[in-house]
């Protein structure tokens, strides 16, 4: 829906369920789609596989949003349960800033009526890591310069190729990491296998004390051709 196709998820769900009933070969089934369009379900899976994630609450109206925000004593963010490209993610230093936003004319509700409130993880440098999986197995990890905000879509149409990003040593917004190791990769692979997901990109942010906080499972993942060309690795 964030790319101008409001009912694409609903139509795709019907198609996938029909194909499943016909026992057709499917890469990323209807369960993969369920996770793609619900961050609430993603959190449930992360919890099930004991993957660390930011403190998170869910709200279904403005009153609940303000009430749940009282659980935070430090900066936090709000995001839509059905998101996409980081659109709709807002940063707040305190409940008073949130109250002005929620009661103002610029408030933007989630398309499914569910809003997440999540602790803000401060990182230095301002980067996140996206781990790509193909056939349910680790392929590579890409470091993403997040200094410009939360819209971190890796697809080529989303990016200005000649923009220099200082957080990555090669100057590109997306940089594939060499000799990458992460003890949670096995947990990620187990989670994907349990849900019948073959292709995915899982994102986490590392806090200043080195703790990993996983916050997103992308089952409609994209690849960045510049980063892949520089590393000689390909997702497709």
What are these model-predicted stretches?
Residues 58, 133-134, 206:
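Generic beta-strand structural signal
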Residues 179, 193-197, 206-236:
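C-terminal active-site "lid" helix and adjoining low-complexity regulatory extension at the edge
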Residues 90-195:
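Phosphate-binding site of ATP-dependent enzymes
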Residues 76, 116, 139-140, 200, ...:
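Protein kinase-like catalytic core scaffold
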Residues 202-204:
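Hydrophobic residue at the +6 position relative to the catalytic HRD Asp in the kinase catalytic loop
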Residues 21, 31-127, 179-185:
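Active-site nucleotide/adenylate-binding loops and adjacent lid/helix of ATP-dependent enzymes
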Residues 1-37, 52-55:
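A short, GP-enriched loop/loop-strand-helix hinge that lies immediately N-terminal to
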């Amino acid at each position: 829906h964030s790319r101008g196709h409001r009912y694409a998820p609903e139509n795709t769900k019907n198609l996938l369920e029909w194909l499943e009933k016909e026992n057709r070969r499917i890469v990323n089934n209807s369960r993969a789609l369920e996770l793609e369009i619900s961050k609430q379900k993603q959190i449930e899976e992360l919890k099930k596989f004991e993957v660390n994630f930011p403190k998170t609450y869910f709200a279904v109206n403005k009153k609940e949003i303000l009430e749940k925000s009282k659980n935070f004593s430090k900066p936090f963010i709000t995001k839509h349960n059905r998101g996409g490209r980081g659109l709709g993610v807002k940063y707040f230093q305190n409940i008073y800033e949130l109250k002005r936003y929620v009661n103002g004319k610029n408030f933007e509700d989630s398309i499914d009526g569910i809003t997440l409130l999540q602790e803000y993880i401060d990182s230095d440098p301002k980067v996140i890591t996206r781990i790509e999986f193909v056939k349910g197995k680790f392929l590579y990890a890409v470091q993403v310069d997040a200094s410009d905000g939360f819209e971190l879509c890796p697809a080529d149409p989303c990016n200005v190729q000649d923009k220099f990003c200082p957080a990555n040593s090669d100057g590109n917004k997306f940089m594939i990491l060499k000799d990458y190791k992460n003890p949670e990769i096995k947990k990620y692979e187990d989670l994907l296998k349990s849900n019948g997901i073959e292709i995915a990109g899982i994102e986490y942010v590392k806090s200043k004390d080195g703790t990993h906080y996983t916050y997103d499972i992308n089952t409609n993942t994209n690849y960045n051709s510049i980063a892949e060309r520089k590393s000689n690795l390909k997702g497709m």
